[in-house]
């Protein structure tokens, strides 16, 4: 049952929270419009609903609008009249979607959710095991309700024989019952207040198993006590019947009927109920009545949750029928199928083709599709312009495709953006807005530069089009979603729109000058760039020829301007360059400086980023369009192709192979003599062949000329890399077998020479594994994204500053002597906690609570500062979200984050989207111990779900000295105190590698052996901040190994959500329950309230929950129920009478309200806009 709290005006839209609880029999009757007495559905001759049946018009309302069953009243003028002949109210047929009925049950039945759920709520309340309860409810055993003065015990079970014997012996001196009625009378006797105080006492005085059971029981008792639910309501006397239009029956072509499974299940219940009534009226023997009651119980079970107990009821073809619970569960259930995502009008889909002539903000929309999508707009315009007299004739004109219609359509789509979406939508750039341009044909045209964001190509991909209708929707699409406004990638703040493939090769070719040409002594000279271009157009000079030009040269690079904030300066100089480079520099703003170098993909990315930071969105979009046109033009002119003759195998390859073969032979001889083990032999052979492969690649690289098309493709970053060229013209190298172990027999041939049969066979393992992995990875990555979104969907920027004084220390990341991530990358776009001062000059580099922008970031790094304390979401004090200061810069815009930004979803998408690129499965390193190292996607999942890692390290829980020993054939490590006493003993496998020598000092939380750490151990031994640091570092490690950049703040948001709950250890005088998981903020509130009242506060310990568990433990039951384990979540919520305050996004999507993010955020909704009064003095002469 759901209650809405309404605001002052009585609109159901105006509620701000929603409550779910158990329904009492009176409530069920009050919802109902009448009792369903017959199992009939519709009459097979008249095809009208049967009276008092499951589709009865008297109960549920008329089948046809404004028409009663007998036909006495037809037409809308009789609205509201109840027909005196058939009793049907004259109203719209829509009421058949909302009017409910009910069935009066002849015997009480138990609701299976509360009996069979885990834990069994009924069992905990009555202190009986679910098995025992089941025996009573399904008429196997009697239960003693009141022993009277007999030696029987209350709640003792008696089988049929024992019951008869005791009846014969004691007569009516004791009371016993069977079935749901007996359980109902036991529930009637439950005194919640008394039970609550008894259990609290028991918890205080007992330990171990009894205490934990008492805690579980107390939780259920408190749920009932505080929610006002009566435990007797878990037993049903009345069964609600859902509206008929939600369980429809439709006629198929062949005259047969298709019906919802629910009708079959309801029919079984009604049949059995009516039969039971008849048997009771006839006074049938007890055994027959009991059997009928049991069957009624089973029929209601099947209706509520088919298959929860025993074999499910099946329909035709042995298919289990879908019960009410199944209607809610899973991907096809009500939550995920209809509430969280719906199919929408004003949408279409088609194949995409490239639109190389489009501007960045445009897309090509096929004429037919546009006409259909914008039909209502076109019709209105036709009537407005008096081309058509009314809407009906306008519709005819549109359908016939008359001349005038196309002109109007052109008019209508001007400046009306449409949204393009490509599935799978892995991040927010999977839906962007474009202005439509009408095109012939039936394919959508897509701008080539947005392909990266959509991950689209033109090999048959399809995309969907959606039309934003309202003025607000169009404005949002234009301002926030227009493709030219989405140049940066939200996951790392780098440009996602950079020229690719043909464009890159074109620009590389354009700016290319060979080393030979560049060393030419006295090139031709020109007095201006225009003169040089003229000479080029007249064929006097070549595109790549070195020339000398007098020109006005920008003196600063884009980066220098960004740092100094000064304007660009120019000087007349004579420059050695080429016509190609002059043409290239004409396409980019002068503020970026003059690029006199060969341009590859990486440099293009930098140019786009600098242009965005210096010149803003619009100018960057223009520049990208010019670069696109230039790139395509010159890649066409270059005509760069790949032919088999472009791959020449270097002769030195054969010498390298011969040398390697000799080395391997020597190792094999050592192995045969027994000097080395097989593992050592394998490792050395692999090492030799890897070196040989690298040597061949090096020789190959040097043998390719600079203007070799393949070399140009690889070096420019247009397509391919040297690994692929190595396989085509060098050697394929070593391959792995299906288990991932490297085969020590290399493939010496390349594809140009062709492989032998054995070589081909060896290489098929990898190819097959690659395909299988890709398929598995996609599904796993999608599921990970779904869990991440669910755990973080309610994290929204809610305030300007939470005034937290805490933060986290960050420094550069090194691995050995190699720099992995410099300091500036980690601090740019974050807010500093303290004032940072230059160690040498004493100058203030950044004030406290000031944003660290690009130049301050570089400045701090140059000053030699190693660590900076920054504000972080991990230490943010804002409730249900984060504050602007702790979050910092919004990476998608490069500016400060706005209030109302849904940063949780942004973070989930940023982590989930690259998931498909991560490798799968474990790798066998084939080292000495042959460890299985979990890497890639499974490792990320393991970290976010905080599972116990495979081959985890043993962690010390005390300080002391290490001593090795053995005990019963097991290796042990003992930690000794100062006086030599043993403080802790840790069993260690013989296979694991130890990190410490005997006698070394160890501290709490140190790992004794190699291997990944268990995050729970870190939390226990080293505390909260250390586990946050570890999780962040480990997740980043996996992504970095695949070359994926993700900003720390996204991962921090997830870690914060995982650490949001605490476990109550001792409740003190608060109303909290021991062992309960509570939000940190709720815990603090309760304690503050208790301290103010002079009571004893509660104590807690921090909890680290995996993302699935954290999602299910969210305060919102709607969000949790729509995620997983729907029935379990709803059972719990109903008993507790939970209130959902509709704080997150999912809850609001489910009930159909605006989401509280972006312009739907309350702070923005409550602003009112009024026209400024026109004052007279504003009008001037």
UniProtKB/Swiss-Prot annotation:
Catalyzed reaction equations: RNA(n) + a ribonucleoside 5'-triphosphate = RNA(n+1) + diphosphate
- What is the free-text note on the cofactor? Binds 1 Mg(2+) ion per subunit.
Q: Where does Zn(2+) 2 bind?
A: 802, 876, 883, 886
- EC number of this enzyme: 2.7.7.6
| SMART domains per record | RPOLA_N
Entry keyword Signal = no
Provide the GO biological process annotations.
DNA-templated transcription
Q: Where does Zn(2+) 1 bind?
A: 68, 70, 83, 86
Gene3D superfamilies (alphabetical): 1.10.132.30, 1.10.150.390, 1.10.1790.20, 1.10.40.90, 2.40.40.20, 2.40.50.100, RNA polymerase II, clamp domain, RNA polymerase Rpb1, domain 3
Binding positions for Mg(2+) per the UniProt entry = 457, 459, 461
Alphabetical keyword list: DNA-directed RNA polymerase, Magnesium, Metal-binding, Nucleotidyltransferase, Transcription, Transferase, Zinc
Q: Which CDD domains does the UniProt entry name for this protein?
A: RNAP_beta'_C, RNAP_beta'_N
Cofactor(s) for this UniProt protein? Mg(2+); Zn(2+)
Q: Does the keyword Lipoprotein apply?
A: no
Q: Which domain of life is it from?
A: Bacteria
Please give the Pfam families that the UniProt record associates with this protein: RNA_pol_Rpb1_1, RNA_pol_Rpb1_2, RNA_pol_Rpb1_3, RNA_pol_Rpb1_4, RNA_pol_Rpb1_5
Give the Gene Ontology MF terms in alphabetical order: DNA binding; DNA-directed RNA polymerase activity; magnesium ion binding; zinc ion binding
Any Gene Ontology CC annotation: DNA-directed RNA polymerase complex
For this protein, the record's InterPro entries field holds:
DNA-dir_RpoC_beta_prime (IPR045867), DNA-dir_RpoC_beta_prime_bact (IPR012754), RNA_pol_asu (IPR000722), RNA_pol_N (IPR006592), RNA_pol_Rpb1_1 (IPR007080), RNA_pol_Rpb1_3 (IPR007066), RNA_pol_Rpb1_3_sf (IPR042102), RNA_pol_Rpb1_4 (IPR007083)
Q: Which HAMAP family does its entry note?
A: RNApol_bact_RpoC
Self-association and partners: The RNAP catalytic core consists of 2 alpha, 1 beta, 1 beta' and 1 omega subunit. When a sigma factor is associated with the core the holoenzyme is formed, which can initiate transcription.
Biological function: DNA-dependent RNA polymerase catalyzes the transcription of DNA into RNA using the four ribonucleoside triphosphates as substrates.
Q: Which family does it belong to?
A: Belongs to the RNA polymerase beta' chain family.
Protein's name according to its UniProt entry: DNA-directed RNA polymerase subunit beta'
Recorded source organism is: Syntrophomonas wolfei subsp. wolfei (strain DSM 2245B / Goettingen)
Its ancestry begins with:
Bacteria, Bacillati, Bacillota, Clostridia, Eubacteriales
| Gene name of this polypeptide | rpoC
